[in-house]
Each structure stands twice: as C-alpha cells, then as structure tokens.
Amino acid sequence: MDNEQRLKRRENIRNFSIIAHIDHGKSTLADRILENTKSVETRDMQDQLLDSMDLERERGITIKLNAVRLKYEAKDGNTYTFHLIDTPGHVDFTYEVSRSLAACEGAILVVDAAQGIEAQTLANVYLALDNELELLPVINKIDLPAAEPERVKQEIEDMIGLDQDDVVLASAKSNIGIEEILEKIVEVVPAPDGDPEAPLKALIFDSEYDPYRGVISSIRIVDGVVKAGDKIRMMATGKEFEVTEVGINTPKQLPVDELTVGDVGYIIASIKNVDDSRVGDTITLASRPASEPLQGYKKMNPMVYCGLFPIDNKNYNDLREALEKLQLNDASLEFEPESSQALGFGYRTGFLGMLHMEIIQERIEREFGIELIATAPSVIYQCILRDGSEVTVDNPAQMPDRDKIDKIFEPYVRATMMVPNDYVGAVMELCQRKRGQFINMDYLDDIRVNIVYELPLAEVVFDFFDQLKSNTKGYASFDYEFIENKESNLVKMDILLNGDKVDALSFIVHRDFAYERGKALVEKLKTLIPRQQFEVPVQAAIGQKIVARTNIKSMGKNVLAKCYGGDISRKRKLLEKQKAGKAKMKAVGNVEIPQDAFLAVLKMDDE
C-alpha cells in the first residue's frame, strides 16, 4: 500500500469507545453493533461477546478493555473501518477507561432511559472531554416501562451541555436505533490525524501474555507504518525487538500485512519479559525513531493494599508468577514480598479499590489454581516521626510505636453521590458516621440531589458503597477521587490471641472509634475462631493498654466418663491431670485462625 492509499484509507477510519455507568447497557450495545455490522457469524454470537473472561460474564460487568475492528457499509456508499474499544464502567476501573479513550477520537455516551445520568456517567464524560473526544449521546432501554427519554434528554443538555437534537434514542436489547447510531458514528466521530510518512509512533494501550508467542501488545498507530520484520524500539526502556506478526482483532486475532495511521491492532515481537511491554509506552522503529514519545497515561497509584498469602507455602513462587502475568495487562497492580508470623511468606499487593482486589484474588484462584488467604485491606498512611523523618505505612503491622510518632496523615477523597430526594438524610447520616465533611449539595431536578463530601479513604474502601446502596434501596450512585492527605488522630489496634499478637489482624482506627471497634471485633472473633482444648483469651490492645477482652471457652472432655462410682480422690486425680495437661497445651498451643477471621476486621461498622 502506498502513502496515498494509506491517507485515503485513514479518512474512512473511525475509532470510538462506549462509556456508561454500570448496568446502563454498554456491553449489550457493543453486541448489537457487532451484529449489525455482520462482524460476527450468527452462530458465534453470544451475550457480552467482548467480555472474554468467565468472571466478566458471571458478574455481568466489564473488567478488561477490549478492542475490535468492524467494517460498515454506510448510506453514503463508502465502506468505513470502525475500531470499537469496549471499556469497563466500575469506579475501580477508571484507569482501563482512560487507556481506551487515549486510543480514540470519539465516544458513545450511553445513558439509561429510566435511571438517567449517574455519578459514574459524569466521571467518564470528564475523562472523555480531557482527551478531547467527540461525544455521541445515546439514550438506551427506551422500551422499558419506566423509561423517560424526554426527561433524560433534558438532563443530558443541562448537565453535560450536549444538544438534545443530537441524542439518539435506542434499545440495544430490542435492536432499536442501532442503524442510526452507526450512521451517527460516521458523521460525528472525526477521522484520525497522523502522517504515514512520519517516523512510527504507536501507543500500547493493553497487553497480554501468551505462553507460546510471548507478549501480545494492543496498539494504536498514531504516525507511520509497522509490519512484520521491522525492528522496533520501546521508548520507555530503549529495548529493541523484531516484529514477528501484526494483526487486527475481529474479535478473533487475524494477521495482516501492515498496520498504518489510525489503525488499532496487535503486535507480537518475541517479547518474553512482561516488563518490556508496558502499557502507556510508545513503540517506534529502531532504524528511524520518533523524537519524543506520545503522552502516555498518568500512572494510577494503588489506593488499597492487602497481604496475599498462599495457603500452601510451596505455592509462593507460583503466586509471584501469577501476579507478574496479571500485572502485564493490569498496570495498576503492584506487589512486593512480605512475611507474616501468622501466615508465612506472601505478597503485599496494591489495588485500585475493593472490587479490583476481589477480582484479582478470584482470577489467581481460578486461572492459576492457587488457594489464597487475604488479610484485611489497608490504605497508605504517612507518619511524621518525632525525629523529623517520614515513614509511609501500607501495612498496619509495620506502624511505628505511637510514642515515636508526631503526626499521622491519611488519604482523603472527594465523594460525589447522586441520591433520590427521599434518602438525603440517610446518606448524610452515613457520611457523618464515616467521619465525612460536608462540602455541598445540588438539587438536579425534583427527584435527585447531588451530594459532595470529603471522606477518609479508609472509610470508603471497605463497605461504604454497600451501605450507601442499602440506605437508598439501591438508587444511589457514587464516584470518588483522591484529593490530599490530612492529619488524623489515628491509633494502631493489635489483636492478641492467647497473649500473642497476630500481626495479620492488626488494623488502624480513629481514636474516637477505637473502643467500639475493638469490642466489636473481639466479640466477632469469638464466634469465628473454633474452640480449642484450652480456653483462649481474645484481646484488643492499643500499645500496652487492653481495651477489650473476651474468652473462647474450651471444649469440654469428660475425663470421668470411665470412672464409675468409686473414690472421690481418683476423680480428683484425673481432673488435676487434665488441668495440668491443659496448662501445658496452653503454653505451647497454636490457635488455628480461619480466613473469615481476617475479613472480620472489614465487616465491622461503628454502630
């Protein structure tokens, strides 16, 4: 293909994403677009086609972004090449969304005709506007009995500033309005810029590991051309590789001769090491490199840390390999080795949020067959010590002694909640209970209010979202962003079993709630830890001070069962012997702690 043909082809390329709040019908719309452009044989069609992970189908959510090429015969007689990049909608996966958007020129904004605009919709719209994308608003599910398309149209105009006349009414499930959406994509989404003669610049927006072919990187070509046999250079590391295959996803991988300006496809270059193909890096040609890399993504820092330990210590190295492979296409995952007296060797792992953590844990157990114990998640605290030095703590067990600490800072987030009017009181009460600071409140219309609070991240990551949903009968939507670290009066609470500290059960809590939390946790542990042959005291302590205590009663064993009638001194002798045995057992006794006990730390509320 010569450059003239490449430029002509570029004019007919449209790169777009679909963005939406969870459950507004994004994956269904993607299915219909695939079906209507005849990209998938009818026999291969299944729901949520682009959600390739079993886990995604089971939970009905999109976790990983996916890119696919479609051909569309438009009414103007031209054939267009569409690259659809499917994105997740959950707040934990905002990073995946920002990666998808960096590879696009436009985005379809899907809004549920019954629910209207929700917090996550707005968050994704701002991301799209930051990337200077053209937006195509679609109101989905218009055939629902509760649908109010006219109200939602007005909302889109008032809150996002898009013209009502540009809104497409659709129902992905019933295949209504899909043809109109496809025509609008041609009209609204601009063709990509870029020069096929310039030095190659390709953005890696995703990558996965194949045991036979090495690393497969998903790329968007911004300038230049790449084909098999080219020697490429990674601009972040300077490492060079020879390209063995370039291709496109249709959704199956299909090798092609070359990828040129505006194309979205994949590249394989015998890259064996996960670290050599980092998401956000720029690929260029070794023989004619670009002068500067493309602007990558802002690195997402983990918000929540927890310890992952294999139940069988033999699996320690397998766990490392599993984490490395997952990290390849999940650049926000971080991990480092950690050891715990209670659990042996494992990894301290950083996640974007609780859903992200659950999913990584489930993927390790499913895809790699490693059984795990996870400790209670914790956020990152900054401690300024009395000697002026600073310490970062992501594991409560490593918190310095309170008398050495001058100040402790914890991360705060700005939380935006959209709530029906009737539940404003309940939501504000929940935020106050979670140490929130009221910022402002906006009445969006007669039905809904937008409430903004500043909250400590530690209170948000555990079960805030679940409680928000239950306090509003499931109607609230929620989004948060990190703002800053603020000074707080925090203490470390240790849990002692049989007089020994269990490092994996330590947690950090605000001093005002320490007593209630400690009391609630020891009572909870009493029910979760199985009874032993001896009595086990469970204590919660701050430093040297015990703030709560309870005992797990011993299992009774009747040593007198064989003693029929007979002498009282005989019975006494047996009882004394049992007592001595129990004392000895207690001195060396090891208490088995089930997985539920580690998670009990989370499930407490301050009530």
UniProtKB/Swiss-Prot annotation:
It is found in: Cell membrane. SMART domains: EFG_C. GO terms for molecular function: GTP binding; GTPase activity; ribosome binding; translation elongation factor activity. The keyword Oxidoreductase does not apply. It is a peripheral membrane protein. The keyword Transferase does not apply. GO terms for cellular component: plasma membrane. It holds the Pfam family GTP_EFTU_D2. InterPro entries: EF-4, EFG_III/V, EFG_V-like, EFTu-like_2, G_TR_CS, LepA_C_sf, LepA_CTD, LepA_IV. It catalyses: GTP + H2O = GDP + phosphate + H(+). GTP binds at residues 23-28, 140-143. SUPFAM superfamilies: EF-G C-terminal domain-like (SSF54980), P-loop containing nucleoside triphosphate hydrolases (SSF52540), Translation proteins (SSF50447). Residues 11-193 form the tr-type G domain. It comes from the Bacteria. Its EC number is 3.6.5.n1. Keywords: Cell membrane, GTP-binding, Hydrolase, Membrane, Nucleotide-binding, Protein biosynthesis. One of its GO terms (biological process) is positive regulation of translation. Gene3D superfamilies: 3.30.70.240, Elongation factor 4, C-terminal domain (3.30.70.2570), Elongation Factor G (Translational Gtpase), domain 3 (3.30.70.870), P-loop containing nucleotide triphosphate hydrolases (3.40.50.300), Translation factors (2.40.30.10). Required for accurate and efficient protein synthesis under certain stress conditions. May act as a fidelity factor of the translation reaction, by catalyzing a one-codon backward translocation of tRNAs on improperly translocated ribosomes. Back-translocation proceeds from a post-translocation (POST) complex to a pre-translocation (PRE) complex, thus giving elongation factor G a second chance to translocate the tRNAs correctly. Binds to ribosomes in a GTP-dependent manner. Belongs to the TRAFAC class translation factor GTPase superfamily. Classic translation factor GTPase family. LepA subfamily. This is Elongation factor 4. It comes from Staphylococcus aureus (strain JH9).
